[in-house]
Amino acid sequence: MTQNPYESPENPQALKIARAGKSLSLLNVLAVTGIVALVIALVLPSIRWAPRSRGRTPCMNNLKNITLAVISYAERHNAFPPAYTVDADGNRLHSWRTLILPCLDKQTLYESIDLSKPWNDPANAKAYGTEVDVFRCPSARLSGGLTTYLGNAANGGCFTGDRPRPVSVTRYPHRQTLLVVEVASSHAVHWMAPQDADETILLNFGSGDKSAHIGVLNAGFVDGTVRTLSVDLDSHIRRALISASGRDEINSTEY
């Protein structure tokens, strides 16, 4: 009986085939490993970025609702709400956030507030203890009724003390005028508090501040749009955006 030459381990031809098979297997493994590494390199950054992007979406939705509520208020009263209301002695009572509650379908909460007494008066304790979801960025992880959504209360901004600002004197195009902005958690205030973002906060907010969204912040504009702005936005662009009476137009590619 003739012996199969390929069954002998000492057969040179068999050894060559075995070595070739091992080489091909090694090459296949290296090729697959390289492909997997490439896929990971391409996909991992997007996976890391996805949660940040998803975290911004609910925040932008909140700002959209707040911005549209302010605009709805302005349409009813022919002016933006004042930054705050005051008593006969000029003491601050309530924030514009309280005034727009009916425009946010929070009529019952609004009616429970005694507007003649300060926001933190015992008479308003129930409202004070109420957390309003639309005023809370999910990524900010705040509690106790705190909000990072502040009005543009800079000099010449949309929220001018206790005096409502007429829409008619607000600069056009409205897409270039900042209305409401999200600030760092360190600047958070109670949603009922008559406090907002002054010029110092708006002009100096930068990468050193701990924004809820890395490197960016969300902002609502007078035209009703909500956009994401870089925390490194140039100072002259910031000044133009916070001015409700400015005449200088800005190229939309600049912000």
Show the residue positions of the predicted features:
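N-terminal intrinsically disordered, acidic low-complexity segments at the extreme N-terminus
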Residues: M1-I17
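Positively charged, low-complexity intrinsically disordered regions
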Residues: N4, A20-S23, P166
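A ubiquitous, low-specificity "background" feature that marks scattered single residues
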Residues: E10-Q13, G34, A188
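Residue-level detector of intrinsically disordered, flexible termini
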Residues: Q13, I17-R19, N152, S243
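Amphipathic alpha-helical segments typified by the pilin-like N-terminal helix
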Residues: I17-N61, N65-A69, E75, A79
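Surface-exposed loop/linker segments characteristic of extracytoplasmic
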Residues: G55-Y255
